[in-house]
Swiss-Prot record:
Monomer. Associates with the 60S ribosomal subunit. Interacts with RACK1. Interacts with DICER1, AGO2, TARBP2, MOV10 and RPL7A; they form a large RNA-induced silencing complex (RISC). One of its GO terms (molecular function) is translation initiation factor activity. The modification Phosphoserine is found at S166, S174, S175, S235, S239, S243. The gene is EIF6. This is Eukaryotic translation initiation factor 6.
Length: 245
């Protein structure tokens, strides 16, 4: 399912949230409305956590993560790190990274198996990515843009890339990521896809300006209409078996 949201009248919600299959981080804000949208969709399946990183609210651009782990920049405070650690599942590894390109969400993007990174990312950061997030790492550009984390969003089901990505590039990226890709936009024509949306395997959140056409493309490529969080599917299956026995 795809849901529209805005953060204090700002439609770039991908800047203020980080969504994975095992947790969701939401920026600390003056209004609870934004948090409530996530809580309403995700409650009972994964923890939704208020957080800031390095004193910033743009947490979606500052960190990178999947269900295995979370990487945050080196200037994240001890207090912030401890708060996130306390709220996330024990299986999720959290690591600070010493990286010149410190807005990790802009220069890296990943699902639970593969990561695309900025061509100039440190070798050490690449190794930490592979180790903590348990992913295969590829240095790549998207539509000749080095900020792969800004112009590409993908889950384990599918992905959305910059609208000017050529068919050849789409095919190459798709074979690397092993998921189908579509070139598109969010927020009524915005090319900065990752700033306008967040997605996991069963749910997507897009900026309030996103048109119904863009929303239907998101639901289609990320296979959201057929997806369910595994915990819900399991409990439904269990109750069905109970009622039949």
């Amino acid at each position: 399912m795809a849901v529209r949201a805005s953060f204090e009248n700002n439609c770039e919600i991908g800047c203020f949230a980080k969504l994975t299959n095992s947790y969701c981080l939401v920026a600390i804000g003056g209004s609870e409305n934004f948090y409530s949208v996530f809580e309403g969709e995700l409650a009972g399946t994964i923890p939704v956590v208020h957080a800031s990183i390095a004193g910033c609210r743009i947490i979606g651009r500052m960190c990178v993560g999947n269900r295995h782990g979370l990487l945050v920049p080196n200037n994240t405070t001890d207090q912030e790190l401890q708060h996130i650690r306390n709220c996330l599942p024990d299986s999720v590894q959290i690591r600070r990274v010493e990286e010149r390109l410190s807005a990790l969400g802009n220069v890296t993007t990943c699902n639970d198996y593969v990561a695309l990174v900025h061509p100039d990312l440190d070798r050490e950061t690449e190794e930490i990515l592979a180790d903590v997030l348990k992913v295969e790492v590829f240095r790549q550009t998207v539509a000749d843009q080095v900020l792969v984390g800004s112009y590409c969003v993908f889950s384990n089901q599918g992905g959305l890339v910059h609208p000017k990505t050529s068919i050849e590039d789409q095919d190459e990226l798709s074979s690397l990521l092993q998921v189908p890709l579509v070139a598109g936009t969010v927020n009524r024509g915005s090319e900065v896809i990752a700033a306008g949306m967040v997605v996991n395997d069963w749910c997507a959140f897009c900026g309030l300006d996103t048109t119904s056409t863009e929303l239907s493309v998101v639901e289609s490529v990320f296979k959201l209409n057929e997806a369910q969080p595994s915990t819900i599917a399991t409990s439904m299956r269990d109750s069905l078996i109970d009622s039949l026995t």
